[in-house]
Amino acid sequence: MKILLVDDERTEREGIRFLIEKFQFELEVAEAANGKLAMEYLQKYQDVDILLTDVKMPYMDGLQLAKYAKENRPDVIIIIFSSYSEFDYAKKACEVSAVNYLLKPIEVEEFKQVMEHVIALCRQKKQWKEQKENLLVADKKLL
């Protein structure tokens, strides 16, 4: 599984990477310093399972990025993290189908729980996709 971390602050990306390693999540980590670079990454690589993005960034904010991801890569699971605690931002995150909204500074235990949930969701989606493909193959054999 692959996660794309998007934040214009390198220390934030390093902190998230540290937590991923600390909890031994089996994730390949890719990074982007802003939404525009992340969008280009998503266009180039089809193997991103999780998009973890900040909201406020130069060139393209995280909500615009999440909207792009949902429209063009509907299987990607989106998590928004931000220092904005206003309800309006959380509402906008829901509108782009984010599965969670984490506040900065990241609470370590909350991050762990969210990531465990999202990784389980990724595994479940992959199983469903494999089952669907197997059923299609079996269906073709019957015809």
Where are these regions (language model features)?
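Active-site residues of response regulator receiver
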Residues: 7, 51-54
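Short amphipathic alpha-helix used as the core "switch/output" element in two-component signaling
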Residues: 40-41, 63-74
